[in-house]
């Protein structure tokens, strides 16, 4: 038996030892399941998340980089633990931790948008993306930052769904494939140039807007919406700089964005701008 056939058989065996509890997403290029590992004696462990990606789409590579880093001893505060990556036929599969909590979208819906909510959660969101940018060389660019791709448990924030994340290529001029959620994705993600750390800065600016207004971002109406929601002017400026069309005009790193956000909160609290707080942050988790 040659090595390639043995690898295929091993992958099939690994794939078949899970029981599918629920299909969470089933798209053309990706399928996401909640699964339980079934032992030889019938006992179960889990739940876990299993994702399948079309091999030809070139998706899911970030998971393997994270798995390799974790196997070498790296520990991440804001990323799910990856347990396995393997190929089955024309698909790549990844099995990972099922992160507890609620999505950021659900938290905003339940608590209502406010500066106070942004103050509590946005720093953790930035820290999560910083792990992708700063703990990997070359950095991982998430490319699909949006409220449904962050999980919140208490005040802890985890970034999930790294399917279209890519490794930055200093020699490339554009992304080979164009994916992402249009309301949050920067112009360069759809053919204007290569995505880099500043592309995630743009998406984080859109996500900050959502935390403040709970509206789907429309780039031409952001300034007006921020004013309508009584967002302090210094914080509006942070959002507007983050979502600049030209990457050179944005904050040049997520850390720079996070520092500007912290400073704007401090200034707003000391100024005559009123911080309008929503309901106390409570997502029902002790």
Features from the language model and the residues they span:
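ATP-binding glycine-rich loop module of kinase domains
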Residues: 28-64
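Protein kinase catalytic-loop region centered on the HRD/HxD motif
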Residues: 127-140
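Short beta-strand micro-motifs within the conserved protein kinase catalytic domain, predominantly
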Residues: 81-91
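Conserved short submotifs of the Hanks-type protein kinase catalytic core
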Residues: 89-103
């Amino acid at each position: 038996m040659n090595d390639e056939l043995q690898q295929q058989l091993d992958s099939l065996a690994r794939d078949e030892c899970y029981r599918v509890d629920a299909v969470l997403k089933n798209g053309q290029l990706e399928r996401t399941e909640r699964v339980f590992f079934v032992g030889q004696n019938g006992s179960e462990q889990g739940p876990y998340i299993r994702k399948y990606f079309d091999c030809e789409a070139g998706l899911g590579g970030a998971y393997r980089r994270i798995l390799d880093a974790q196997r070498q001893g790296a520990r991440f505060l804001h990323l799910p633990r990856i347990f396995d990556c393997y190929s089955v036929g024309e698909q790549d599969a990844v099995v990972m931790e099922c992160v507890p909590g609620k999505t950021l979208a659900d938290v905003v819906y339940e608590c209502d948008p406010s500066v106070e909510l942004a103050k509590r959660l946005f720093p953790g969101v930035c820290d999560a993306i910083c792990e992708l940018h700063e703990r990997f060389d070359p950095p991982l660019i998430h490319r699909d930052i949006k409220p449904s791709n962050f999980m919140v448990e208490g005040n802890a924030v985890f970034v999930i769904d790294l399917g279209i994340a890519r490794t930055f290529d200093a020699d490339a001029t554009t992304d080979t494939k164009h994916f992402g959620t249009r309301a949050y994705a920067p112009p360069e993600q759809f053919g204007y140039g290569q995505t880099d750390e500043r592309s995630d800065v743009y998406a984080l600016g859109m996500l900050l807007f959502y935390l403040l207004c709970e509206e789907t971002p429309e780039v031409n109406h952001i300034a007006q919406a921020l004013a309508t929601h009584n967002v302090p002017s210094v914080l509006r400026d942070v959002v507007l700089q983050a979502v600049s069309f030209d990457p050179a005009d944005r904050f040049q790193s997520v850390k720079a964005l996070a520092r500007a956000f912290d400073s704007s909160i401090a200034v707003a609290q000391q100024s005559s701008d009123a911080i309008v707080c929503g309901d106390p942050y409570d997502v029902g988790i002790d």
